[in-house]
Amino acid sequence: MWSQSFLGSAPKLCLFSSSLPPFSHHKIHKFFCFAQNPSSTVSINLSKRHLNLSILTLFFNGFLLDNKAKSMEELQRYTDSNNGFTLLIPSSYTKVEKAGANALFEELNNGSNNIGVVVSPVRIKSLDQFGSPQFVADKLINAEKRKESTKEAEVVSVGERAGLGQQVYEFEYKIDSTRGGIKRVFSAAFVSSNKLYLLNVVHSDKPENPLDSSTRMSLEQVLHSFDALPLT
């Protein structure tokens, strides 16, 4: 643990010395800092044990941050040229076929965690013609509440961002269902070329096994990556 006391003016020169023989078990390192006033000195003692602990702490913190960064990088680009959309998908998810979905990806060995995209023709040219982000969020949550399996549903957040030539609405909501318990849902929607694009990212968020921050950040990246392809 570092302790420091400055006397007089700012330190000008620092020297390193050892207070005990090199092979002493409790070797103490001393850093003597001489200020501009020779009579004002600062002595900082740091035991070898504390030094080792500090190094280990830095090492493991760096290791954990590195692992977290790697987990954030485990996303791959998926592009559907026929339907005109693109997004990032976690590498642990595999594509499956299901009626009603233009694209569906499920987590390996845990199909309840999934990412789905549905594309439908509409008459409107932009999403704001349908309503505000809050209006659309209310429609989504009311649709969830009408399901027999839904015990409770609540909107967590509502947002909006600029996509490729169109506005993208983003939503986060929480559902407690008889089918799989509590789930966290991230949704995004936009209209392009008279088509409604809807993304649903569903992940388990049970009290005994809550959604961890690293996974959440990855799923948010998926949400923010959902966009239309450039018109050719």
Curated annotation (Swiss-Prot):
It comes from the Eukaryota. It holds the Pfam family PsbP. PANTHER family: PSBP DOMAIN-CONTAINING PROTEIN 2, CHLOROPLASTIC, PTHR31407. Keywords: Chloroplast, Plastid, Thylakoid, Transit peptide. The keyword Thylakoid applies. GO terms for molecular function: calcium ion binding. It is found in: Plastid, Chloroplast thylakoid lumen. GO terms for biological process: photosynthesis. Signal peptide: none annotated. InterPro entries: Mog1/PsbP_a/b/a-sand (IPR016123), PsbP_C (IPR002683). This is PsbP domain-containing protein 2, chloroplastic. Belongs to the PsbP family. The lineage of its organism: Eukaryota, Viridiplantae, Streptophyta, Embryophyta, Tracheophyta. The keyword Thylakoid applies. GO terms for cellular component: chloroplast; chloroplast thylakoid lumen; extrinsic component of membrane; photosystem II oxygen evolving complex; thylakoid. The gene is PPD2. Residues 1-34, 35-71 form a transit peptide.
